[in-house]
UniProtKB/Swiss-Prot annotation:
Catalytic activity line of the entry: Broad endopeptidase specificity
One Pfam family linked to the record: Peptidase_C2
Organism from which the protein derives: Rattus norvegicus
Limits of the Calpain catalytic domain: 55-354
Domain (EF-hand) ranges: 557-575, 584-609, 614-649, 679-713
Gene from which the chain derives: Capn1
Renumbered residue ranges of the record's region Domain IV: 542-712
Post-translational modification: Undergoes calcium-induced successive autoproteolytic cleavages that generate a membrane-bound 78 kDa active form and an intracellular 75 kDa active form. Calpastatin reduces with high efficiency the transition from 78 kDa to 75 kDa calpain forms.
UniProt xrefs under InterPro entries: C2_III, Calpain_cysteine_protease, Calpain_domain_III, Calpain_III, Calpain_III_sf, EF-hand-dom_pair, EF_Hand_1_Ca_BS, EF_hand_dom
SUPFAM superfamilies: Calpain large subunit, middle domain (domain III) (SSF49758), Cysteine proteinases (SSF54001), EF-hand (SSF47473)
Keywords: Autocatalytic cleavage, Calcium, Cell membrane, Cytoplasm, Hydrolase, Membrane, Metal-binding, Phosphoprotein, Protease, Repeat, Thiol protease
Binding site for Ca(2+) 2: D627, D629, S631, S633, E638
Protein name: Calpain-1 catalytic subunit
Length: 713
């Protein structure tokens, strides 16, 4: 049995972000040009296996215990005892990938709590075009079989092509997880494996919302409806959604974990994900009745109330009409009245598809835009509006609404612009094995005042203290995504996505969906420094008292070394009892000398020390001004305001880097680190200004100049 050794080359940090942006500009990540997940190329790997006469084994998701899980399905769990990884060709003499097209009965739940995923897969079978975006044509256990398959999934704004081998978890010769009702089709089991791979393990799929899988199969965006507060036109909404090819799922909420997957007296499963597969009207006793068709991934547990498979209501429906609805017994699919649907279920999810997924000129297409962002402790993770001191540091996005809705779209007489906002946190399932789960997330929308219109600047704390939000996410909740349909008058608005509490880190995707065109942009400050012209005094112009002080400090050589500078600064700072500091380190002082040393001798002369001295005095004034709680140190967020007061405007990425480099583990910034940061910033800006001879904001270095500058900066 072959093992295909995959050795992808990874970029890290800033270089990874640059490479990702270049890939996006080249069109990578679109469905027609999907990114090869983990660098694995399906066609090349398959061709290599066929050429060598071996079957593929995926070292990126190997048939070992950690691929199953980390706790309930971990290496020492009794639930994984006896599991063996086998290929379908070892289980059956004639396994099939798909027989007569993919159908809803191909999906039956196994021992994994991923009914939410299987409900989405069942809905996927209703639309052949969408199905084969996820499950590419041309895969088989017969012609060209090499033990390798591939699937395409949408992952946080981009499509990825995921390769898997066909080694599946089995126990006693049967599949442990998803399987087909007939037992001889394996496309759904292999799709489940691909989904487990991108999420880190099978166990990572346990528990979730159908909307997650809906979106990962389509790139669409999901809306939620509380069926206890259902709008009066919900049945029409469902009909239109099905007509548009949307994917629908529903469930019954539970209030106690002991109720999870408990069966009601009418045979519905609590906390279990169902897919909505159709909606029709039938004539019953002379009246039209609204019906909903449901699918239970378990297969055999079906609704036993009115309009169930063997209920008497069907006897009073015209046989032709009954045949059109294809009522079958015990196949996991059943009909129920819309009235009972509202009464029995508590939540409905509708995944609206994007224009590229719909591929139809007859349907109204969405205008879509998305942005990727991060929340980082101390710089961009400000928490929700309950934390006014830090809320303003969150990433901000502007949306410009110009075209109002068509008059017949809404009942309201007031004109307005409708759009859908969706905030998604990234990679949280994959991080479950490290003890991290979903953060509580949401967003707020603010109207931009007329005097600030058109300005692409990050709004500061005072704005949010003085202005209330115009809209917000309905809840802050620990789901992968929160979304809301919002309607506002034309104008400019600021969207602020956040975690509920400050300093909760994560990556996110913010998506805008609108039926009318709307302008969007990410807000960030432009990098600039408002520095006064540097006035360099000659030795004769320097105050005599300062010369006397310098003579005492410098010694016989009349220059201050790195060690002498450390002694001087720490002696001075120790007299300021209101400052929290560990003192200037030798490395910090070496950095200051390197940055201020103009003649390159590694020491500071009278003029050089005079410049540094005056700067430190100015920095002390700023530090005390922005140490708002008089703790002797600044918080990371106070640091951001202090940097701006010192004349520097930086974008959020630079603020992230500064906090990473200059703050303590508790995100406090001591005076010594504050000084080092500002000295470095000012010197680097001045270096750049000198080197930017064309004044075009671009400087070109050869390798020597680059190393010379960066090694001693």
């Amino acid at each position: 049995m072959a093992e295909e050794l995959i050795t992808p080359v990874y970029c890290t940090g800033v270089s990874a972000q640059v490479q990702k942006q270049r890939d996006k500009e080249l069109g990578l990540g679109r469905h027609e040009n999907a990114i090869k997940y983990l660098g694995q190329d399906y066609e090349n790997l398959r061709a290599r296996c066929l050429q060598n006469g071996v079957l593929f084994q995926d070292d990126a998701f190997p048939p070992v215990s950690h691929s199953l899980g980390f706790k309930e399905l971990g290496p020492n769990s009794s639930k994984t005892y006896g599991i063996k990884w086998k290929r379908p060709t070892e289980l059956l003499s004639n396994p099939q990938f798909i027989v007569d097209g993919a159908t809803r009965t191909d999906i039956c739940q196994g021992a994994l709590g991923d009914c939410w995923l299987l409900a989405a897969i069942a809905s996927l079978t209703l639309n052949e075009t969408i199905l084969h975006r996820v499950v590419p044509y041309g895969q088989s256990f017969q012609e060209g079989y090499a033990g390798i398959f591939h699937f395409q999934l949408w992952q946080f704004g981009e499509w990825v092509d995921v390769v898997v081998d066909d080694l599946l978890p089995t126990k006693d010769g049967k599949l442990v997880f998803v399987h087909s009702a007939q037992g001889n089709e394996f496309w759904s089991a292999l799709l489940e494996k691909a989904y487990a791979k991108v999420n880190g393990s099978y166990e990572a799929l346990s528990g979730g919302c159908t909307s997650e899988a809906f979106e990962d199969f389509t790139g669409g965006v999901t809306e939620w409806y509380d069926l206890q507060k259902a709008p009066s036109d919900l049945y029409q909404i469902i009909l239109k959604a099905l007509e548009r090819g949307s994917l629908l799922g529903c469930s019954i909420n539970i209030s106690d974990i002991r109720d999870l997957e408990a069966i009601t007296f009418k045979n519905l499963v609590r906390g279990h994900a169902y897919s909505v597969t159709d909606a029709k009207q039938v004539t019953y006793q002379g009246q039209r009745v609204n019906l909903i068709r449901m699918r239970n991934p378990w297969g055999e547990v079906e609704w036993k109330g009115p309009w169930s498979d063997n209920s008497y209501e069907w006897n009073k429906v015209d046989p032709y009409e009954r045949e059109q609805l294809r009522v079958k017994m015990e196949d996991g699919e059943f009909w129920m009245s819309f009235r009972d649907f509202i009464r029995e279920f508590t939540k409905l999810e509708i995944c609206n598809l994007t224009p590229d997924a719909l591929k139809s000129r007859t349907l109204r297409n969405w205008n879509t835009t998305f942005y990727e962002g991060t929340w980082r402790r101390g710089s961009t993770a400000g928490g929700c509006r309950n934390y006014p001191a830090t809320f303003w540091v969150n990433p901000q996005f502007k949306i410009r609404l110009e075209e109002v809705d068509d008059a017949d779209d809404y009942d309201s007489r007031e004109s307005g612009c409708s759009f859908l906002l969706a905030l998604m946190q990234k990679h949280r399932r994959r991080e479950r094995r490290f003890g991290r789960d979903m953060e509580t997330i949401g967003f707020a929308v603010y109207q931009v005042p007329r005097e600030l219109a058109g300005q692409p600047v990050h709004l500061k704390r005072d704005f949010f203290l003085a202005n209330a939000s115009r809209a917000q996410s309905e809840h802050f909740i620990n789901l992968r995504e929160v979304s809301n349909r919002i309607r506002l008058p034309p104008g400019e608005y600021i969207v602020v996505p956040s975690t509920f509490e400050p300093n909760k880190e994560g990556d996110f995707l913010l998506r805008f969906f609108s039926e009318k065109k709307a302008g969007t942009q990410e807000l960030d400050d432009q990098i600039q420094a408002n520095l006064p012209d540097e006035k360099v005094l000659s030795e004769e112009e320097i105050d005599d008292n300062f010369k006397t002080l310098f003579s005492k400090l410098a010694g016989d050589d009349m220059e201050i070394s790195v060690k002498e500078l450390q002694t001087i600064l720490n002696r001075i700072i120790s007299k300021h009892k209101d400052l929290r500091t560990n003192g200037f380190s030798l490395e910090s002082c070496r950095s200051m000398v390197n940055l201020m040393d103009r003649d390159g001798n590694g020491k500071l002369g009278l003029v050089e020390f005079n410049i540094l001295w005056n700067r430190i005095r100015n920095y002390l004034t700023i530090f005390r001004k922005f140490d708002l709680d008089k703790s002797g140190s600044m918080s990371a967020y106070e640091m951001r305001m202090a940097i701006e007061a010192a004349g520097f405007k930086l974008n959020k990425k630079l603020h992230e880097l500064i906090i990473t480099r200059y703050s303590e583990p508790d995100l406090a910034v001591d005076f010594d680190n504050f000084v080092c940061c500002l000295v470095r910033l000012e010197t680097m800006f001045r270096f750049f200004k000198i080197l930017d001879t064309d004044l075009d904001g671009v400087v070109t270095f050869d390798l020597f100049k680059w190393l010379q500058l960066t090694m001693f900066a």
